[in-house]
Regions:
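Short acidic, glycine-rich surface-loop motifs adjacent to enzyme active sites
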Residues: 74-88, 224-236
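A glycine- and small-aliphatic-rich helix-loop capping segment at beta-alpha/alpha-beta transitions
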Residues: 21-29, 93-105, 121-127, 158-164, ...
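Accessory alpha-helical/coil subdomains and C-terminal extensions
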Residues: 2, 8-12, 28-38, 152-231, ...
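ATP/nucleoside-binding phosphotransfer catalytic cores, i.e., glycine-rich phosphate-binding loops
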Residues: 241-320
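ATP/NTP phosphate-donor binding region
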Residues: 1-70, 245, 265, 288
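Short beta-strand segments
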Residues: 8-10, 81-83, 106-109, 143-147, ...
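Short Gly/Thr/Asp-enriched flexible loops that form oxyanion-binding sites at enzyme active sites
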Residues: 84-103, 239-248
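Internal gly/pro-rich beta-alpha loop/helix module
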Residues: 107-178
């Protein structure tokens, strides 16, 4: 029996073409729909679910993908989502925190549009189909497949503006590799809390620390509209003392604040006890989020709030 794979196209560079001037533009005719399938034992059913550049993707679109996957899961052995690379990691992480069905779910994209020299779209697409048809992938969580590598949605991030090997997993490395004749996995995804949301809303912005920062950015926030805040802190988890003092206002109003490091590698933890240091911030109620970058920590908090987590449950989830 062939493996039936549902493909959900959402737009992005993988669906685009370069015009005569070299500018990459959207196309109503997705070139991936014209790719002949040379893979034996794989039957593809493709849908043009969205046609959006990924900076236009919102949480509501991610939720729609989740709902479509749940709706169709019994009819397919795996799912491939083609997606723009700018926010691909956020969609992948969102899906990875949902109660997705126990089938392989793989996201892929391209760094070069379909008619550019060295286009990587078709190769990544076929690689994603191979992984989605592999039963072993069902136990790995939501996956990102690009450039012969398999990455866990939780950890992968876009690291280069144009390079085809842009998707990397800092600290941990890839989950597996795609070889000519086989797929090699050398890591497993850890168990995680999953949610079944039917709506997602809320305002959780990201603020990055910088030298000389005081309290001006916090003052600009409309606290009546704010549901939570992500701080991208220095080093192990430190911010200027003026900013730390202003965060107290948010915390006293019951607005959750979560912290990650702005460093590319490593994990934020409370180490320093000076004003604005991580020890003081944790004592004041700031959540220290492990192993996630700011954009994923934002989704972690947004999802937790929409799931109704509060108090100690929210703290345990955010810091777990």
């Amino acid at each position: 029996m062939p493996k039936k794979i549902l493909v959900l196209h959402t737009g992005g560079t993988i669906s685009m073409q370069a015009d005569a001037s070299g500018a990459v533009v959207t196309s109503s005719d997705n070139p991936m729909n014209h790719v002949s399938n040379p893979l034996e034992g794989i039957q593809v059913h493709a849908l043009d679910f969205f046609n959006l550049p990924s900076p236009h993707i919102k949480p509501k679109h991610m939720l729609a993908l989740y709902q479509k996957i749940k709706e169709e899961a019994d009819n397919y052995d795996g799912v491939v989502i083609t997606h723009g690379t700018d926010t691909l990691e956020e969609t992948a992480y969102f899906l990875d925190t949902m109660e997705v069905p126990h089938i392989p779910i793989v996201l892929t994209g391209a760094m070069r549009s379909s008619n550019e020299l060295g286009s990587d779209g078709v190769y990544n697409y076929l690689s994603a189909l191979r992984v989605a048809s592999d039963d072993r992938a069902a136990d790995k969580g939501v996956l990102v497949v690009m450039n012969d590598e398999i990455h866990a949605a939780k950890y992968v991030t876009k690291t280069h503006t144009t390079n085809v090997s842009t998707f990397q997993t800092p600290t941990h490395g890839p989950l597996g590799l795609i070889m000519k004749q086989e797929i090699l996995y050398f890591k497993t995804a850890e168990p995680r809390v999953r949610f079944d949301l039917d709506h997602i809303q809320g305002l959780v912005p990201i603020i990055s620390a910088y030298a000389g920062m005081t309290d001006e950015l916090i003052d600009m926030l409309d606290l009546e509209q704010l549901d939570g805040l992500i701080i991208q802190a220095f080093g192990a988890g430190n911010i200027p003392k003026e900013t730390a003092q202003k965060l107290e206002n948010l915390l006293q109003k019951g607005i959750p604040v979560a912290l990650v490091s702005r460093c590319f590698n490593g994990i934020a933890e409370p180490v320093y006890a000076y004003q604005g240091g991580g020890v003081q911030l944790q004592k004041s109620g700031v959540f220290f989020v492990k192993e996630l970058n700011a954009q994923k920590a934002r989704f972690k908090l947004l999802i937790a709030l929409n799931a109704g987590l509060t108090g100690q449950d929210l703290k345990d989830y955010m810091e777990g």
